[in-house]
């Protein structure tokens, strides 16, 4: 399986064979695509981060409250099932590639556990 990350504004540029899956807490109005909420940040620490912009706080809480509670292999298997066995998916959230976003933490977690992940960078 090939896993990309990207942001909602770039979904329109994804190749046709890539299945986009939102991993945000709340997808944009009008989003008709797939959603996988288990990787979404918890409101409790997300709201504090929105006020403080303390990335270290966010990383600590995202890791302990989200990623450490999940099995990476189970997550990948659930994403495969959700995507109807597509061999290429894109995990989608809001921020552009250079901005802080939990999808970068997800990508690191997946990579550290043997899955190849990269930011989808084709833009039209």
Question: Where are each of the predicted segments found?
Answer:
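Residues lining hydrophobic/aromatic ligand-binding pockets adjacent to catalytic sites
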Residues: 1-124
